[in-house]
Amino acid sequence: MDREETLLKLKNNPEYIKELTETDEELEIFIVKNSGNNIKYIENPSKEVQKKAIKNTPLSAKYIKNIDKEIGIICVKSLWNSLEVINNPNEEIIEEAIKTKGWAIQFVKEPSEELQMLAVSKDYDSIKYIENPSENVQLAAIENYYVAIRFIKNPSLKAKVKAVISNGEAINYISNYDLDDIKVFIHQNINVVKYIYESIDVEIVIDILKEKVKEENIEKKYIEDFLELEVLEMDKINFVREYGSKNAKKILVDYKLSM
């Protein structure tokens, strides 16, 4: 059988390559260019054959027993979830997959904290694929976007507070908190009150505010947010004048002058 006849037969039936007593890289490339999945008919494909197959069909990686590192990286960069089908990927392939999409962490058995950090820094919600994330990982995810708290089953207090500081609305995404937690949240971000006003005793809020406004290092934003908090009906200006530190009163004056 001449070359042309062989190519024609391979085109119609790529599995025919297994019947050839002698094959070469050109023939192997020919069948994987038609469909990357045809690499399953090739024993020990060369790096170039792997490359052609992967570029054609990234998920054909599942048919490669010993994928070349460079090819594995090309594969996961092209399609992040192809990591799931790669046999025994090395650390570099895993890392590149996670750099492409944090969700790739779900295909890594017992990922290191370093890989977890990489994942949540890339995509905050990839933390939902991490079982019992450490506090550092929780904080990194929340640093990326506060809504990450929504996907953490048992967030640490520090993680909860970080989310709430970022946005008071974060309290809507925290499933487990108690009164002591709420006091800390309000102390850090008065805007939390917007989302829990109907379920909290106003006197508790007032007590927290008395402690907060007397702090000399109180932030300008906290005072401004307090003054603009419509849901809390009270004489806020006189409250700051009566209970506020020197700095709080200065912020109040500056705020009134800017109106």
Language-model features: where?
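Alpha-helical scaffold segments
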Residues: 1-259
